[in-house]
Amino acid sequence: MSGNVTTAGDMNVMPGRALRVAKTTIGGNLENGGTVQMNSEGGKPGNVLTVNGNYTGNNGLMTFNATLGGDNSPTDKMNVKGDTQGNTRVRVDNIGGVGAQTVNGIELIEVGGNSAGNFALTTGTVEAGAYVYTLAKGKGNDEKNWYLTSKWDGVTPADTPDPINNPPVVDPESPSVYRPEAGSYISNIAAANSLFSHRLHDRLGEPQYTDSLHSQGSASSMWMRHVGGHERSRAGDGQLNTQANRYVLQLGGDLAQWSSNAQDRWHLGVMAGYANQHSNTQSNRVGYKSDGRISGYSAGLYATWYQNDANKTGAYVDSWALYNWFDNSVSSDNRSADDYDSRGVTASVEGGYTFEAGTFSGSEGTLNTWYVQPQAQITWMGVKDSDHTRKDGTRIETEGDGNVQTRLGVKTYLNSHHQRDDGKQREFQPYIEANWINNSKVYAVKMNGQTVGREGARNLGEVRTGVEAKVNNNLSLWGNVGVQLGDKGYSDTQGMLGVKYSW
């Protein structure tokens, strides 16, 4: 049955049967064991089903159209003058809604009598823009009615009750609920701008070991580094918790070396890399999660100047520029994946000054030279995602490209040489460094104009420790582990291994 219907008697929708309504009044009772289709073929919300008697749900389905936004959003609606009982599944199709913060919610079902019936969304939630809507009972004078609300009902996924037997209740004072997908978009844009970011010692290890054959002429060398890292971050007022694992491979080599005054040294080289990251965002307010994936490449140039080529003390300046391109994906439970790309340039200028702080002998014939090296670095991060519209109609625009990251720190290390290594060119250099890192922008995503941003990463403290070693005149190795800590639960831990071969 379909169309505008007025009936004075009762109506029973049997299993396997459907009642399609536009503006319908049932003078008696309605039992639903099949499907009551509220949404019209044209898709425009506004249909009303009025039941003058009682409504009984026999595990039937009701479908509604709604333009999901604030409290006054257009929607299909059922008005029951009598009582409700039984269980009913509800499907809501969003028709052009961009999402918004609700107060009381969008009224879907109005009940005049005893409201003992239970209504639950078939998918648990419905999404629009950055917001997640649930179906919940009202409070106070509206406690009999059912609303679509983007407010948190106070229940976490870990202890979510059966919505049929324990229906949630709308609290107008509760905070809004954001989609977990927001955390995945944020993680991807942050990774696109930082995966290939590095420092001079990340790329070449200890400069004292650079060009160990330069006394015999201009040396050639190739280097490679591997990085693995794990990041934890939060977004959306702390309700979205993201963990991400990454891998980076970079390699390169010098194109040219020269001196301008027989004391300094210039290096010009090329480099390229591959990286990927997989993130998982879990909401503490809704029971589904989101996965983010990014993988891509970079290629570019680097240039380095050392004031004192003989022992690499004094000042140094290092710079690099990379073009980066990535493929991105965001997917979530029972929702279609969103694939998009990102492109852009990252560039850095780093400077420091190395001075010898002292020399002492160890107990077993080791000669140790202590160095201190203050450092400063500015990195411009210009990788941008392509603005696009998801299949569900949500407009996606990420923010944070153009971030300027500033690093100030100090590194101290010991250059150790044991007397049994005389004539073997073998040296080891343990070190520790501490840094303060500032980001000028917050990585964020706008979903239909609503911004959700990463938290706790504007200012970071970092500690690194590692060892650098010259195995022989041809081979150098280096490795380190480091931890960055921010506020609001932000942390990043990584390990790196590098190798360079000269000939």
Question: Can you name each region flagged by the protein language model?
Answer:
Residues 1-83, 87, 93-94, 98-152, ...:
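Extracellular beta-solenoid/beta-roll
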Residues 2-10, 18-29, 53-55, 143-203, ...:
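Primarily extracellular Gram-negative trimeric autotransporter adhesin
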Residues 99-115, 238-257, 395-403:
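Short secondary-structure subsegments characteristic of cysteine-rich extracellular domains
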Residues 107-109, 222-223, 267-274, 317-321, ...:
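Extended hydrophobic secondary-structure segments that form protein cores and membrane-embedded regions
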Residues 163-363, 480-482, 487-494, 500:
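Outer membrane beta-barrel translocator domains of Type V secretion systems
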Residues 300, 375, 382, 391-503:
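Outer membrane beta-barrel transmembrane domains
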Residues 386:
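Structured binding elements
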